[in-house]
Structures are given as structure tokens and as C-alpha cells.
Design a protein with these regions (language model features):
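Conserved structural motif at the start of ABC-family nucleotide-binding domains
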Residues: 2, 17-19
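The feature captures the beta-strand-to-loop junction immediately N-terminal to the Walker
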Residues: 33-35
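Helix-to-loop junction immediately C-terminal to a conserved catalytic motif
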Residues: 48
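Conserved ABC ATPase "signature" region
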Residues: 87, 97-114
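Catalytic Walker B motif of ABC-type/P-loop ATPase nucleotide-binding domains
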Residues: 143-147
Length: 194
């Protein structure tokens, strides 16, 4: 599904990512690790099509509409409710039965009681859980998750553990995390950036 050959990214004279090469088959799970500033976020943005490589070749064999991206920004509308946000994204992605799918995800991630609350009133952890719902709403073939456990309490992190275990082998997943032990058992490949 993904082939990267000597992929680099520069911003002006700053090299944000240096000569990364890897392959990931459909259904695989790539765990990207490395210290702050090593290029993890840059690589995930490249995979999501939000940036283009300066050098090298990057091939992602997935339709853009079949990609789910969770970055550092939640990409949610603060003035809309949780349910309205998911219904909006459901329309954009043409999700059949979007209200039912949104309700199921809100229930799964412990947000059903807050479904009619404006996102601007949410805690950081609630916002992260809703962003995960948004990312999973259209059942993407490729999930690109940048620090998905960020701001999650233990209960929500355990929910995400279960979700990732359920997706293992059925979806292609690329994720970065400061807690690699959480997902090491699911990873079919590991990429350590320096």
C-alpha cells in the first residue's frame, strides 16, 4: 500500500525529514518512533497528502477519500455540537447512514451524553476522542495517526487500544506515539527516525 524511497522534506534550508525508505503492505501497521524534531509529524503529513516530498519517491496506494488522518489539530468545528461535526464529515465523505454511524462511534468513545454539546466546551481529552471518531467515521482503508493517545485518560486510551486491535490486519495503519509499548504488539513494521 505504501512505498517510500529516500523520501526527504525540507522547509527552506531546514531538513525536516531525511532519506526515509520503507514499504508497508495492505493491512500492515507501521509504528513510527523517534525524538521530537526527528520528522515523525512531517512523514505522517506526507503520507496524508498534506505536503509533498522535496526529494525521493512516495507512493500511497489509497484513494484520498479512503484515508483517515488524525494530526495535532482536531479539525473540528468548535461552534458545532459533537453530533453535528460528525454528521458534517459524514456528508463530506458520503457515509451512508451517517447519523447511526456517528452515534455508534460517540457511544463507543464515551461521548454519547455530550453529543449535543458544543465542541468548544469540551476538554482536551474529549476533543481528542471526538477527533478519533471523525477519523474513523468513514471506515478508511488507510489510517494515519499522529500521537493518537495524546490527552487521553487511561480509560479512553484503552478504548483506542481495543479499536486498533480490531482494525489490525483489516486496515492499514501508520502511527506515531511517545508510548510505543502500547502498540508494539500490533505493529507489523517499525520505523525509527533520528
Amino acid at each position: 500500500m505504501i512505498t517510500a524511497r529516500e523520501v526527504e522534506k525540507r522547509y527552506g534550508t531546514t531538513r525536516a525529514l531525511r532519506a526515509v525508505s520503507f514499504e508497508l503492505a495492505t493491512g500492515g501497521c507501521l509504528l513510527v518512533t523517534g525524538p521530537n524534531g526527528s520528522g515523525k509529524t512531517t512523514l505522517l503529513r506526507l503520507l496524508a497528502g498534506l505536503a509533498t516530498p522535496t526529494r525521493g519517491r512516495l507512493e500511497v496506494r489509497a484513494e484520498r477519500s479512503r484515508l483517515g488522518y488524525l494530526g495535532h489539530e482536531p479539525l473540528l468545528y468548535r461552534d458545532l455540537t459533537a453530533l453535528e461535526n460528525l454528521e458534517l464529515y459524514g456528508r463530506l465523505y458520503r457515509v451512508p447512514e451517517r447519523r447511526e454511524r456517528a452515534g455508534m462511534l460517540l457511544e463507543r468513545f464515551g461521548l454519547w451524553e455530550a453529543r449535543n454539546a458544543r465542541v468548544g466546551s469540551f476538554s482536551r481529552g474529549m476533543t481528542q476522542r471526538l477527533a478519533l471518531c471523525r477519523t474513523l467515521l468513514h471506515e478508511p482503508d488507510l489510517l494515519v495517526l499522529d500521537e493518537p493517545f495524546s490527552a487521553l485518560d487511561d480509560a479512553a486510551a484503552s478504548l483506542l487500544d481495543g479499536e486498533l486491535a480490531t482494525l489490525a490486519g483489516r486496515r492499514t495503519v501508520v502511527l506515531s506515539t511517545h508510548d510505543p509499548g502500547r502498540v508494539l504488539a500490533l505493529a507489523t513494521a517499525r520505523l525509527a527516525l533520528a
